[in-house]
């Protein structure tokens, strides 16, 4: 689960991290009221959406030369003018896709005189099974670009869970970030704070980009992105209360209601598979044959006929889907049950796009017979390779 920047900063502030004074606003009147209470003279007006690249984004409703989703203002009047222009508009960034996201709230905070921009994040290091810091002196830009072009400028430090962040870890991180004086002192305090917040709140990602050194030598969290482990949210009702459903894909919300693991993608071939590994393999082979998957959808190991029907409804709700591939290995799940669900779903949704079904495992012959005897336009496949080729051919021939 993701939260907004202002929520992330509020959470980090509760742990003692240095963040600027700021307030989230939902109207022009609120913006004017609260901007007057900030010291100024420099303000930052930030669009609050669950996507990166806001500063370089553009608003659909504004001219192409208009400013992006993060703006500087040098007076309360400028703050108000920017809020009027940004609030309620659709911001398009490299992460939103061409449809963009509507800006329903803005975050107004004190500006800062920046000397240096750094990168810092915490995540789960899958290699060591530990929480790791990832730091770089190249802050304020896309870390993937840094990793691709100058990987030597990125340092990863895994933390021993039995000891936590030690003095030696702090020294290492400060050295990698070239911190000295007040900034080094702040860093030695900040690193344990961030680690504590990450672990106690069951985060999956804590990214600060940039972490800045100000002209007085002090550190400040200038931007913050936080994601939480969905499987641990039952332990954190306070965090669950921060969820903004309007920022989530409606199809993913609907899928979660039926215990379906669904992630929307940008392709045109819908996938319904049981098991995450098989789902990944299915998406890979679709790409191998020259097409793109429209989604990841794992129906799990004990899907019922009703669950399969819901899965079809979710897949077909995506207007980009031009064909569907069902790939099921029946272990716990029986192929005849899946076949019945597929037939029921095709009839209920009135499927208009090509459908390829590959079944293997428990009761596979019964499952194939159900599909073949249905009289519906369903293409049967013998194996995964055959299935991928058939759905790609069907979509490209449509």
Swiss-Prot record:
EC numbers on record: 6.2.1.5
Residues reported to bind substrate: 274, 331-333
ATP-grasp domain mapped to chain residues: 9-254
Cofactor(s) demanded: Mg(2+)
Record GO biological process: succinyl-CoA metabolic process; tricarboxylic acid cycle
NCBIfam families (UniProt xref): PRK00696.1, sucCoAbeta
PANTHER family: SUCCINATE--COA LIGASE [GDP-FORMING] SUBUNIT BETA, MITOCHONDRIAL, SUCCINYL-COA SYNTHETASE BETA CHAIN
Protein name: Succinate--CoA ligase [ADP-forming] subunit beta
The organism's taxonomic lineage, starting at the top: Bacteria, Pseudomonadati, Pseudomonadota, Alphaproteobacteria, Hyphomicrobiales
């Amino acid at each position: 689960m993701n939260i907004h920047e202002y929520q992330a900063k509020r959470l980090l502030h509760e742990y003692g991290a240095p963040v600027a004074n700021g307030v989230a606003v939902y109207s022009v009147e609120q913006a004017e009221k609260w901007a007057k209470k900030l010291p100024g003279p420099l303000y930052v007006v930030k669009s609050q959406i669950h996507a990166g690249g806001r500063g370089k984004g553009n608003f659909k409703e504004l001219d192409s030369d208009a400013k992006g989703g993060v703006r500087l203002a040098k007076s309360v009047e400028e703050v108000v003018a920017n809020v009027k222009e940004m609030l309620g508009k659709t911001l398009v960034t490299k992460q939103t896709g061409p449809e963009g996201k509507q800006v329903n709230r803005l975050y107004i905070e004190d500006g800062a005189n920046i000397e240096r921009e750094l990168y810092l994040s915490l995540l789960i290091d899958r290699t060591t099974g530990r929480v790791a810091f990832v730091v770089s002196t190249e802050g304020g830009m896309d870390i993937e670009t840094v990793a691709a072009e100058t990987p030597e400028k990125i340092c990863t430090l895994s933390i021993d869970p039995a000891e936590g962040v030690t003095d030696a870890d702090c020294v290492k991180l400060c050295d990698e970030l070239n911190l000295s004086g007040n900034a080094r002192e702040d860093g030695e305090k900040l690193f344990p704070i961030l680690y504590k917040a990450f672990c106690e709140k069951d985060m999956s990602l804590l990214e600060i980009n940039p972490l800045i050194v100000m002209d007085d030598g002090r550190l400040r969290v200038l931007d913050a992105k936080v994601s939480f482990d969905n499987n641990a949210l039952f332990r954190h009702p306070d965090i669950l209360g921060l969820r903004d459903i309007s920022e989530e894909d409606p199809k993913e919300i609907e899928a979660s209601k039926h215990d379906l693991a669904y992630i929307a993608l940008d392709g045109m071939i819908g996938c319904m598979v049981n098991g995450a590994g098989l789902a990944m393999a299915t998406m890979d082979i679709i790409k191998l044959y020259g097409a793109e998957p429209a989604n990841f959808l794992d129906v799990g190991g004990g899907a019922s006929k009703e669950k399969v029907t819901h899965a079809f409804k979710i897949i077909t709700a995506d207007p980009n889907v031009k064909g569907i591939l069902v790939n099921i290995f029946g272990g716990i799940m029986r192929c005849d049950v899946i076949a019945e669900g597929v037939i029921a779903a095709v009839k209920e949704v009135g499927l208009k796009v090509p459908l390829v079904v590959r079944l293997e495992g428990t009761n596979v012959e019964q499952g194939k017979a159900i599909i073949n005897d249905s009289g519906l336009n369903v293409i049967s496949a013998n194996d995964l390779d055959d299935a991928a080729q058939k759905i790609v051919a069907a979509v490209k021939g449509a």
